[in-house]
Amino acid sequence: MAAKAFFDIKAGDERLGRIIFELFNDVPDTTRNFRELCTHKNNFGYKGSVFHRIIPGFMCQGGDFTNGDGTGGKSIYGNKFKDENFNHKHEAFSLSMANAGPNTNGSQFFITTVPCSWLDGKHVVFGKVVSGIDVVKKMESLGSTSGKPSKKIIIEDCGEC
């Protein structure tokens, strides 16, 4: 059975709700990294971090818990880790690793809001939203073409479910 993880999301002072992700079994290193960052097993992770880049009609990006602006973050394996495979495609509401080129996965991730086939083979898809699509759509509505959200979008809590 596939592992699941959750984010409880806030926009400013307003609670938007919970997103539940199903994590794929065929990318075990990537899903382990995400799960342990959700649970803070190594005393660092996603809780309290922000979605720093949200582009309507594309995606919501977060996971930079060190700098909060897309320049930081780290994996449970050290700084960066390899691309495991590209078995899954970027469909709407896919969970995928953000990177700076091949084999540069850290902690940053994004949730697609539409199919993004041009990202296939470049970013590792490791899960999908199974509950809380309405929350992702609310987050998306607070984004902009520049990517800067109109409100601070925070992962108030996170973990495994």
UniProtKB/Swiss-Prot annotation:
Enzyme Commission numbers on file: 5.2.1.8
InterPro entries: Cyclophilin-like_dom_sf, Cyclophilin-type_PPIase, Cyclophilin-type_PPIase_CS, Cyclophilin-type_PPIase_dom
Keywords on record: Isomerase, Rotamase
GO cellular component: cytoplasm; intracellular membrane-bounded organelle
Domain (PPIase cyclophilin-type) ranges: 6-160
Pfam families assigned: Pro_isomerase
Gene Ontology terms for molecular function: cyclosporin A binding; peptidyl-prolyl cis-trans isomerase activity
Catalytic activity field: [protein]-peptidylproline (omega=180) = [protein]-peptidylproline (omega=0)
Presence of the UniProt keyword Isomerase in the record: yes
Annotated TM spans: none
SUPFAM superfamilies: Cyclophilin-like
Regulation: Binds cyclosporin A (CsA). CsA mediates some of its effects via an inhibitory action on PPIase.
Domain of life: Eukaryota
Enzyme class of the recorded protein, top EC level: isomerase
GO biological process: protein folding
Expressed in which tissues: Found mainly in the tegument, gut epithelium, and muscle layers. Also found in the interior of the parasite.
PANTHER family: PEPTIDYL-PROLYL CIS-TRANS ISOMERASE (PTHR11071:SF569)
Protein purpose: PPIases accelerate the folding of proteins. It catalyzes the cis-trans isomerization of proline imidic peptide bonds in oligopeptides.
Family indicated by similarity: Belongs to the cyclophilin-type PPIase family. PPIase A subfamily.
Protein name (record): Peptidyl-prolyl cis-trans isomerase
Organism: Schistosoma mansoni
